[in-house]
Amino acid sequence: MKEENGFAGFLNTAVNRLSGVLNDTAPTKSQSLKNGVNNEGNRGFSLFRNPRFMSDEKLSSEASSHSTLGQQQARDGRQSPSKEAPFGEGELKLENFENQENEADEAENEETSYSEQNHTENTEEIAEESRPLERTHSGSNHHEASSTGHLNLPPLENTLSQGSAITAPSRKVSITSSNGVSARLSGYAFANSKRNRDFHRIFKVLPPEDHLIDDYGCALQRDIFLHGRMYLSESHICFNSSIFGWVTNIVIPVTEIVSVEKKSTAVVFPNAIQITTLHARYIFASFISRDTTYQLIIAIWKNTHPFLTTLANGHGVMDASGNHHSGSSNQSINADSSAGSEGVDEGTSTEANDESSEDDDEDNNTDEANEDAQSNVSDESPKGEGSSHSDNVVLSDGNSVKKMNEDGADTSLLSVSEVTSHPPTEWTGSPLAHVLCSDVVNLSVSTVFNLLCGSDTTWIINFFKSEKLTEIKIGKWEKIDDKWNRKVQYIKPVAPPYRQTSCYITDTIQHLDINNYIEILSTTSTPDVPSGTSFVVKTLYALSWAHSSKTKLNISYSVEWSKSSWLKGPIEKGAQEGQASYVKDLLTAFENYKVSPKGRRKKITKHTKKKNKHASETSVAPEKVDNSSIEQSSSFLTKLYTFPFTIITWLMHPTHLLLVVMFSMLVLQWWYMQQILHAELPSTSSRSDSSRDLDFDHIPMDDTAFKLWITSRLDSVERDRDFVYENSDPNLEHGKIKIATDYMERRLKKLKERLRKLEASGYI
């Protein structure tokens, strides 16, 4: 019984404390406490607030209000609900506390979800104030309270205590380096901030967000090995070397790398890595841990191109299309050659202009009937369609141009008549994706067309030669599907390491109207290069008439892809550069081209040709002699003037400078050894010839040596004398002293005679 009374007292204390922190009830507290029940039949209690967020003034005001209410209840003759409801009686039962605890858990979950929805931007911060939730008792409990006349207690609610927290949603976890930068390369950490600052201090061209991962000691293989360090970052592979003030910096973007291979130095030592880009090849040797460096380079490379697959032997890569690209092959990836070389898209040279002028002179020697025999457009079907491919091309090898068909004539080639005057016209077509030029050329439309696509391919072939193209093959014009087509093929040299590449061009005349406009589409493909089968370059040429019978030339191009490739960016960049260079050369060629003046030409016989030829030879011969002599003298002066600059340029090469320094050191060493071996004594060099003649009685030592000997002997005699006196032995070393004294007397006598002779001869 005592235990039950103690537990009842504990419950009464808990109820009093709970009633002290209750929030405002729904009608006024005084009215509800006086009546004992709610007028509306339901008693509502609000979720009380956390005392941590309540001000002291509010707590004190609530305490005073509750004390006032208690006094008012006492005056009304009512007892406290806690006194009227001892343990086991009334409406306060243990089941109520259990039900209220479950309901409190549900309320806490609802409150937590609500707080998460309102704090999505910063989920780690706890809401400063919880949203109150209102709960009501059921109608049955209210009916029981009204019937018994007792006041039902509010349900026990769980609230956010001072140590509670709201669960934040899951966040993405990333591994960060020591300097706080999130690493995008999985499994590798960035270098510390000091090394990163030193890295950007050396390579100032790199963006600051390109962080250093690691660096390794190695040597760049060139004419000599340049020892330095390789720096690996997220987007670049860099190398720095400083030898005797010669600084070498290399920055290789990872996006331009074609292959990464393991190599051996001197075919024996497996400590080198070869990195090949679109335009260059770099060999780094002398790695202490070659495999570790190689794996990191491959990881960075794959991080930039996630769909790359390294082959099993570690040589070359394979792209998503399955094409294997080997870094050791001689294929060219130079987009300059794959995009900028078209069948009608090369520049000219002075040699081409000279040969064109010679062709015009030969045309002037034809008959008048041949002058008027020009057709507008040759619509004849090509001959020899069943012949081999070699019979339908014009081959240029070296300086010779050969037509491969047997009869020596190419009647299927296209040509248009020369129109010298025409009003302006407008090109109604649309350009391709990238416009290269829209300029006016000081030539007629017919002239420009004949130079590019005419039957006489001398100009275009010479132009190809000026661009250093080889194995030029220009096919015949063939009419296919009412459109003229021509095949062009040549080999273009490119930058190392690939040396050259083959280009295949198809020229198609889409619209041919000399009185309106001409439209030519040239399609270039380079299947031999990596990803060469995945794209073609199309170039559109539009010729229309401008003012003063000139030509309005519109050139545009586009790169069309049939497959996806990881070299798309570099290839399109190279295509843009190659096309821009080509257009510049082409416009220069048209400006340098000169049309021979047309006029009434006389019929020239064979006798007239021979006579004119002989006169021209006799008149030009002296000029050639004079010009040759002038050229020789001018060339000699030019060489003499440029010789110092040539030497300086030659010495600027590190290898040459090192050889010169080593040779100079060898010469200096040889001279120094000669000076040591054949050195002359000071007194000997000062002697005159006359004194040598007078020295008939030669003394076996010079003056300086004699003085040194005298001094040493006197010291020795002095020491011996002291020793003799101290030891009282007069016979000790007596013989040696006597010999020295005799020699000194003879020496003194000879010196006196020599002095006398010099005085007699007048030297003293």
UniProtKB/Swiss-Prot annotation:
Ranges annotated as spanning the membrane: 647-667
The keyword Cytoplasm appears for this protein: no
Membrane topology, Cytoplasmic segments: 668-764
Name the record gives this protein: Uncharacterized membrane protein C20F10.07
Any Gene Ontology biological process: intracellular sterol transport
InterPro entries xref list: Cholesterol_transport, GRAM, PH-like_dom_sf, VASt
UniProt KW keywords: Glycoprotein, Membrane, Phosphoprotein, Transmembrane, Transmembrane helix
Glycosylation positions in this chain: 23, 118, 240, 330, 364, 376, 442, 554, 627
Residues carrying Phosphoserine: 80
CDD domains: PH-GRAM_GRAMDC
Region (Disordered): 22-173, 320-406, 598-626
Cited Gene3D superfamilies: Pleckstrin-homology domain (PH domain)/Phosphotyrosine-binding domain (PTB) (2.30.29.30)
GO CC list: cortical endoplasmic reticulum; endoplasmic reticulum membrane; endoplasmic reticulum-plasma membrane contact site; mitochondrion; nucleus-vacuole junction; perinuclear endoplasmic reticulum membrane; plasma membrane
Segments of skewed composition (Basic and acidic residues): 118-145
Pfam family, one: GRAM
GRAM domain mapped to chain residues: 197-264
Membrane topology listed for this record: Single-pass membrane protein
Topology Lumenal: residue spans: 1-646
Domain VASt: 432-598
Coiled-coil stretches noted in the UniProt entry, renumbered to this chain: none
Regions of compositional bias (Polar residues) in chain numbering: 25-41, 61-82, 158-173, 331-340, 389-399
Database matches in PANTHER family: GRAM DOMAIN CONTAINING 1B, ISOFORM E
Residue ranges with Low complexity bias: 321-330
Matches recorded under SMART domains: GRAM
The family this protein is said to belong to: Belongs to the YSP2 family.
Biased composition (Basic residues): 598-613
